Amino acid sequence: MSTSVFNRRWAALLLEALTRHGVRHICIAPGSRSTPLTLAAAANPSLVCHTHFDERGLGHLALGLAKASTEPVAVIVTSGTAVANLYPALIEAGLTGERLILLTADRPPELIDCGANQAIRQQGLFASHPTLSVNLPRPTPDISARWLVSTLDSAMAQLQHGALHINCPFAEPLYGGDEQQYADWSASLGDWWQDCHPWLRQTCYPPSLYQPLAQQADWFFWRQKRGVVIAGRMGAEEGRQLTAWAAMLGWPLIGDVLSQTGQPLPCADLWLAHPRAQETLAQAQIVLQFGSSLTSKRLLQWQTACQPQEYWLVDSAPGRLDPANHRGRRIICPVGEWLSRHPAQRRTPWATELAAYSESAQAQVIETLSGQFSEAAVAHQLAELLPDNGQLFVGNSLIVRLIDALGQLPAGYPVYSNRGASGIDGLLSTAAGVQRATAKPTLAIVGDLSALYDLNALALLRQSSAPMVLLVINNNGGQIFSLLPTPEAERQRFYCMPQDVNFEHAAVMFSLGYARPNSWPQLREHVHQCWLRGGTTLIEVQVPPSQGAETLQQLVQQVTLIPQVAP
């Protein structure tokens, strides 16, 4: 038996089976044990191959591709610690729903737990984080091609959310051999190779989807009540639909930075601190939350404390998604589908004073930030930097909170992020995947520690199919800890950890454009030129370390003193 040839036959069938379930992008790291998978991917005309030398970044590249394409994306890595490096991206996908297929090459069973090189226990390595796991046997002609393709079809049909881990042991040799061998094994599938459908067309009915989505029987009753809408993470079209729907009902909509609703009541993180605004919201009889991953501290505090008669949470992702554990209903379905089944009825707005508090908060922001070139000012004016027909990727930590609190993004403008586990690892890689999936002009904004954490992902940005700007807000450390009651004496050394770096040489190292503007007009002009010029440019904005956190705290205090508005 020519082991190397049959390994490749096995891998070719595996990759072809995945394409029948919509896999179009595949991300590949270098490695020898994964050779059968890599060669099969390279030879498959249905696959677009992406490569990266760092498996942690590779996993996040796939995550970004899956986010923006809404398609399942496959990843190939070799055995050993290369597999473990996929963990952060897998965890994020499990929380935010992107479908990843992790193809992890492995040593055969006889090389495990005996001191063989680069051999670790890969089965079950990811514990409960994958949605599904398949441990394939070592390739052998004794196992039919029908078994392999049916196993893969069954797993892919069940994958509605999160990651599928397929562990793939391969014995040596991995190279050479007569390519004509074992053609009969592949040919046993007949004309399937010329088809475009799965071998096994398995239909899965998750519990929430046994029947088409039915309208809530008492919706016509509740839509006549005083309601509040909370908008978390959702798609661009869903955000537009929700904004119009809430406006017709006359219900206030509190939109997260990721909601793509246009945040009709901007600066919610500020005005929600006003006692009178809280009193108004307390009159709500029903709260409807669409999407999860809320950013605002004040919104989360209000969401936890509110006690409406009913609390409904609508999101296509499974699970509870409500850490406050409200009494009410958890409806698992796409936001747009729910809205179409639950029409709004035009009603007079019941909480008009909230708009006044929002306008006052926004005016306070404009006054406070006037003439500043600061982290807070960039967050407030970020919408002015967005490219036409483009997209935005927002990092984690302090910057996303400042944009949420001080900015207002256009309704329906695509916004992406990693707000499942909210880590700062892999943000540049994820942004690269988002850009590759859509080929749209892309603005990505992250902090300096996030950029350092994923610095070698700048290699992924060298070849972009549309203009890309990476905006690094350098506040010299993790200044989000300045918002928290961390011990002052230990804050800098053990929490913020300032690194005293600039990113000019990093940009040069990876052949990227670079700019370091010193004013808002300079920043705006640099970004505008980037959209015209193309390629990728790293723009570094150096700001005083704690100014962003201090400005946010100052504005919260100022807004609480806004005079009470008559209802």
From Swiss-Prot:
| Names of required cofactors | Mg(2+); Mn(2+); thiamine diphosphate
Q: Sorted alphabetically, which keywords does the UniProt record give?
A: Magnesium, Manganese, Menaquinone biosynthesis, Metal-binding, Thiamine pyrophosphate, Transferase
Q: Which GO terms describe its biological process?
A: menaquinone biosynthetic process
Q: Which reaction does it catalyse?
A: isochorismate + 2-oxoglutarate + H(+) = 5-enolpyruvoyl-6-hydroxy-2-succinyl-cyclohex-3-ene-1-carboxylate + CO2
| Pathway of action | Quinol/quinone metabolism; 1,4-dihydroxy-2-naphthoate biosynthesis; 1,4-dihydroxy-2-naphthoate from chorismate: step 2/7; Quinol/quinone metabolism; menaquinone biosynthesis
EC assignment: the record states 2.2.1.9
**SUPFAM superfamilies, from UniProt?**
Thiamin diphosphate-binding fold (THDP-binding) (SSF52518)
Has keyword Cell wall biogenesis/degradation?
A: no
Cofactor comment: Binds 1 thiamine pyrophosphate per subunit.
One GO MF term, please?
2-succinyl-5-enolpyruvyl-6-hydroxy-3-cyclohexene-1-carboxylic-acid synthase activity
According to its UniProt record, which protein family does this protein belong to?
Belongs to the TPP enzyme family. MenD subfamily.
* Subunit architecture: Homodimer.
What function does the entry list?
Catalyzes the thiamine diphosphate-dependent decarboxylation of 2-oxoglutarate and the subsequent addition of the resulting succinic semialdehyde-thiamine pyrophosphate anion to isochorismate to yield 2-succinyl-5-enolpyruvyl-6-hydroxy-3-cyclohexene-1-carboxylate (SEPHCHC).
By what name is this protein known? 2-succinyl-5-enolpyruvyl-6-hydroxy-3-cyclohexene-1-carboxylate synthase
- Designated gene of the protein: menD
